[in-house]
A protein has these predicted regions:
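A short, structured active-site edge motif that brings together acidic residues
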Residues: 54-67, 88-97, 156-157
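Short, acidic/polar
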Residues: 11-24, 69-84, 137-140, 162
């Protein structure tokens, strides 16, 4: 699916279940979660009671940093799958690259973790495998050692954070780009240029940001627990951003970024 529903910071329990149900009601079929979000169980309950057949759903989860390595990743996957109440997962990602310390060591860690994903894929427990927050210098050594190349790279992507180098690398290697935080922070939604462009199309700034991701060949994963915003974020297929406006958005100064750099994170 070309549009997904993100669940980062989505509360566990009824609020989360209601949010996923609302997303399913509004046509989302791609639900993105992760072991680190602590809400896989909630997502699983919502899917089981959401009234949508399994074959129509596309479910993503991710292995966390403390479970890197071959055996630990296989164990972590089974824990995630049990919480989600699924026979298989549609997409499994390495959440963050190992990138600290000696280069040879972190490259080996990523390669061993990837080998576990390849095993899950070949065993039919995962339909697609990929990475998250990987830059080209993380991807290249992993790809050199891989039997199966990454199919997806999920990165922070929004106006003011256009990740051109990583997107171009992924496009060259047929790696699908997914966009977490496609709306950026509140500063993105308050940017006057984006407000003016959105007004010219009769859409909200949030819709403009999501549409920009789509037209930049990325799959946006907007998140919300507000029913109205969940619905609004799905209504992005009725307009096209012109090439001129796409370029104006591309050229925004850095804006609304999370500050999370895969080369320097310490979690």
């Amino acid at each position: 699916p070309c549009l997904g529903f993100g669940t980062w910071k989505m509360p566990d329990g009824e609020v989360g279940i209601d949010a996923v149900h609302q997303a399913l009601h509004d046509g989302y079929r791609h639900i993105d979660t992760a072991a680190a979000y602590d809400n896989e169980g909630t997502v699983g309950k919502a899917l089981a009671s959401g009234g949508i057949s399994r074959e129509d759903l596309f479910i993503t989860t991710k292995v966390w940093n403390t479970d890197r390595g071959y055996d630990a990743t296989l164990k972590a996957f089974e824990e995630s799958r049990a919480k989600l109440h699924l026979d298989y997962v549609d997409l499994y990602l390495i959440h963050w690259p190992a990138a600290q310390g000696a280069e040879a060591e972190w490259q080996r860690t990523n390669q061993e973790t990837w080998r576990a994903l390849e095993t899950l894929y070949l065993d039919g427990l995962v339909r697609a495998i990929g990475v998250s927050n990987f830059k080209p210098h993380h991807l290249e050594p992993l790809m050199d050692a891989a039997d199966i190349l990454p199919m997806v790279d999920q990165i922070e992507l929004h106006p003011g954070c256009n990740q051109e180098v990583t997107r171009e690398f992924c496009n060259r290697h047929d790696i699908v780009v997914e966009a977490w935080s496609p709306l950026g922070s509140g500063r993105v939604l308050e940017n006057q240029l984006l407000i003016d462009i959105a007004a010219s199309y009769g859409c909200t700034v949030a819709q403009l940001c999501i549409r920009w991701c789509l037209q930049r060949r990325a799959i946006p994963l907007p998140k919300s627990t507000d029913a109205g915003r969940i619905s609004e974020n799905a209504r992005v297929f009725w307009f096209d951003i012109t090439d001129e406006d796409l370029q104006r958005i591309d050229e925004l100064d850095p804006l609304g970024q999370s500050g999370l750099d895969p080369d320097t994170i310490d979690f």
